């Protein structure tokens, strides 16, 4: 490992290894055996990181638990665990780590649940290693990498930063509670030498509003977790903020494509119905269909240069009068209006057309806008059947903790 180099949460790699061995010893002492599921109900920070790597040393399967869940949801996720960890793990250091195989499950990772009930996905040590190597090949790797993580560690986008950084022997900074001003300040601070940060679109928008410009050491903002409005990318470009739009999902151990290009070693194809299909060493074997591909449920296409474009979700397509409408396309047009801060497009039953297109819109502070103005804005940029039949002005939109729109709460 990296010895005295900082690993995460102020711990050097030597200190992290010592803490992980103590955590592994505590797990073994409490009867955890290789392959046993261990629920990690810990706040993000050094104790969580030590417990995670302790699970790996003991050959156990780590299951990160979201502490914000209700009692019933937590019980459902913890019921198969042989141990629920709620306090720091400290025991006699485990001297001999369990010999692991690439096909051994490392983490039971729950999906975000934005479009369906959250479900556990088994991700192996081989999945994590393949993902880390492919990501480094796509984005490059700075020996002095410092990766800021404001994403929840209970989701794959956040946890992947911890695991990749350990594989690279580089530094991760865990930011347990996202605050736009604090993130903007950290990225602007040359002394912190932050080279990478992972954000979702709503986070980036807030960081830019907080005044981030020309961060001195930043190589990339890895931006994913939902549709990325072109207007947001333009704002980032004007501010001198380097953005790598990223497409991924839990079943693929986070990244599938970055800046439109599939990661090295990852195969992507478009099915006849425009669904994106994926396979590769980063994909959970349990997520593969009988045809050997991960059917993502996302819709997409390749542009003239061979770059992957995401056009929407199969389950979210609105069928109005026999025409298909992708909500993300309409949202992107709405967000081009200077008075619009956020937008969500969804469907409502329509006796004549089957479904009608409806938009919920959040205006920027101090802005005013009539429904007719916004519909006229869309009419000049979209086919008539895609223009929202109704526009509702709201104060906020329902989003998951990773920034994904929860459309079902509006429709």
Mark where each language-model region is.
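Conserved pre-ATP/AMP-binding loop-to-beta segment of ANL
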Residues: 3-6, 92-110, 117, 126, ...
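Gly/Ser/Thr-rich phosphate-binding loop
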Residues: 194-199, 203-259, 267-269
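AMP-binding/adenylate-forming catalytic core of the ANL superfamily
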Residues: 280, 299-386, 396-398, 403, ...
């Amino acid at each position: 490992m990296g010895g005295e180099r900082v690993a995460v949460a102020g711990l050097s790699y030597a200190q992290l290894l010592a803490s992980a061995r103590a955590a592994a010893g505590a797990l073994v002492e409490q009867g955890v055996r290789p392959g046993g599921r261990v629920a990690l109900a810990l706040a993000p920070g050094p104790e969580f990181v030590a417990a995670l790597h302790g699970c790996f040393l003991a050959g156990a399967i780590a299951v990160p638990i979201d502490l914000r869940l209700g009692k019933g949801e937590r019980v459902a996720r913890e019921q198969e665990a042989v141990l629920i960890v709620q306090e720091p793990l400290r025991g006699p250091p485990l001297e001999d780590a369990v010999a692991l195989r690439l096909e051994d499950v490392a983490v039971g990772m729950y999906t975000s649940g934005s479009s369906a009930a959250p479900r556990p996905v088994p991700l192996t040590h081989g999945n994590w290693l393949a993902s880390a190597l492919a990501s480094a090949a796509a984005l490059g790797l700075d020996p002095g990498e410092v990766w800021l993580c404001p994403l929840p560690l209970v989701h794959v986008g956040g946890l992947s930063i911890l695991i990749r950084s350990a594989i690279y022997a580089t530094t991760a900074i865990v930011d347990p509670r996202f605050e736009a001003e604090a993130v903007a300040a950290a990225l602007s601070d040359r002394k912190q030498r932050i080279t990478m940060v992972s954000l979702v679109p709503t986070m980036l928008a807030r960081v830019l509003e907080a005044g981030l410009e020309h961060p001195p050491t930043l190589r990339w903002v890895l931006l994913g977790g939902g549709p990325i409005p072109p207007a947001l990318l333009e704002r980032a470009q004007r501010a001198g903020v380097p953005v790598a739009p990223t497409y991924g999902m839990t079943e693929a151990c986070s990244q599938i494509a970055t800046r439109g290009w599939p990661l090295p070693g990852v195969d992507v194809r478009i099915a006849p119905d425009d669904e994106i299909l994926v396979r590769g060493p980063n994909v959970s074997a349990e997520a593969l269909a009988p045809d050997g591909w991960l059917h993502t449920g996302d819709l997409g296409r390749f542009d003239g240069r061979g770059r992957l474009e995401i056009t929407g979700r199969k389950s979210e397509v609105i069928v109005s009068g026999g025409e298909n409408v992708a909500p993300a396309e309409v949202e992107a047009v709405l967000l081009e209006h200077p008075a619009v801060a956020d937008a969500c497009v969804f469907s409502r039953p329509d006796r004549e057309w089957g479904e009608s297109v409806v938009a919920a819109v959040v205006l920027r502070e101090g802005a005013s806008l009539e429904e007719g103005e916004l519909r006229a804005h869309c009419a000049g940029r979209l086919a008539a059947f895609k223009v929202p039949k109704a526009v509702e002005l709201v104060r906020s939109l329902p989003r998951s903790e990773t920034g994904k729109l929860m459309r079902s709460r509006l429709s």
